[in-house]
Amino acid sequence: MSMSTSTEVIAHHWAFAIFLIVAIGLCCLMLVGGWFLGGRARARSKNVPFESGIDSVGSARLRLSAKFYLVAMFFVIFDVEALYLFAWSTSIRESGWVGFVEAAIFIFVLLAGLVYLVRIGALDWTPARSRRERMNPETNSIANRQR
């Protein structure tokens, strides 16, 4: 690399280099300022989590059902779908009928996926036993009478 080429690269990217230096310097300044201005209390109560003035009871680790993660994933998927459809709706005049057909196919594929999720029971919150009881109430009442 010749001297003129490296000078051209530096001249071309000087603003980004200054931005990086200022950003890293600001982060370091805030960390050092927090270290100097922060408290130094070393009591036993410093290691206990604070919950609005109430002593904590039990474990803070809660086991969540996988259903919550599924719902979160479905939300992200359909939120991205809405993002794509919004982008399509802003350019509907330029895309014409071809864009309309492509958007319709996109919606159809996502609706087919949603129907599939409903059919396999991915969106059901109740266990299979209570779902059977809800579907066949006469069988459930006969079983209760025999007991």
Curated annotation (Swiss-Prot):
The keyword Transcription does not apply. It is an enzyme of class 7 (translocase). Its main location: membrane. It catalyses: a quinone + NADH + 5 H(+)(in) = a quinol + NAD(+) + 4 H(+)(out). GO terms for cellular component: membrane; NADH dehydrogenase complex; plasma membrane; respiratory chain complex I. InterPro entries: NAD(P)H_OxRDtase_bac/plastid, NADH_UbQ/plastoQ_OxRdtase_su3, NDAH_ubi_oxred_su3_sf. GO terms for molecular function: NADH dehydrogenase (ubiquinone) activity; NADH:ubiquinone reductase (non-electrogenic) activity; quinone binding. GO terms for biological process: respiratory electron transport chain. NDH-1 is composed of 13 different subunits. Subunits NuoA, H, J, K, L, M, N constitute the membrane sector of the complex. This is NADH-quinone oxidoreductase subunit A. It comes from Escherichia coli (strain K12). The lineage of its organism: Bacteria, Pseudomonadati, Pseudomonadota, Gammaproteobacteria, Enterobacterales. The gene is nuoA.
